[in-house]
UniProtKB/Swiss-Prot annotation:
CDD domains: Ribosomal_L22 (cd00336). Part of the 50S ribosomal subunit. The gene is rplV. The keyword Metal-binding does not apply. Transmembrane segments: none annotated. Keywords: Ribonucleoprotein, Ribosomal protein, RNA-binding, rRNA-binding. One of its GO terms (cellular component) is cytosolic large ribosomal subunit. The keyword DNA damage does not apply. This is Large ribosomal subunit protein uL22. Coiled coil: none annotated. This protein binds specifically to 23S rRNA; its binding is stimulated by other ribosomal proteins, e.g. L4, L17, and L20. It is important during the early stages of 50S assembly. It makes multiple contacts with different domains of the 23S rRNA in the assembled 50S subunit and ribosome. The globular domain of the protein is located near the polypeptide exit tunnel on the outside of the subunit, while an extended beta-hairpin is found that lines the wall of the exit tunnel in the center of the 70S ribosome.
């Protein structure tokens, strides 16, 4: 490996140390309903985002809360010497993409059938540390 390539790889590795992510695949909720909850926590600090999700009455908020806790644990595993409160973690990015669709048929009048689409989604949460983000800018 060349010197330049090694330097860029090390720089990328250091940049990735300040972020952590978690993924939830094939969650049996429609993407539209999940995006309503995801928009509430996008850009929020982690503590505030957890409170928003805990006190939300939507079913999607329970799944997002578990995913956010998983992302926090991933960050703690990456940064064993770092302190969670001092790092100032926030929800840097949250993506809700459409997942697999189960297609079912429901009988309709006059011998026809209507297609029922049971939608699912994929959610990705990326956490970033405020201290590192501001020092790099």
């Amino acid at each position: 490996m060349g010197v330049r390539k090694r330097e860029t790889a090390d720089a990328r590795k250091e940049a990735n140390k300040s972020i952590a992510f978690a993924k939830l695949n094939n969650c049996p909720t429609s993407p539209r309903k999940m995006r309503l909850v995801a928009d509430l926590v996008r850009g929020q600090k982690v503590e505030r985002a957890l409170n928003i999700l805990r006190f939300s009455s939507k079913e999607a908020s329970r799944k997002l809360e578990k995913l956010l806790l998983s992302a926090i644990n991933n960050w703690e595993q990456k940064n064993s010497e770092g302190n969670l409160e001092e790092a100032g973690l926030f929800v840097k990015e949250i993506r809700v993409d459409g997942g697999m669709m189960l297609k079912r048929l429901r009988p309709a009048p006059q011998g026809r059938a209507h297609r029922i689409r049971k939608r699912s989604n994929h959610v990705t949460i990326v956490l970033g540390a405020i201290n590192n983000t501001q020092s790099n800018s």
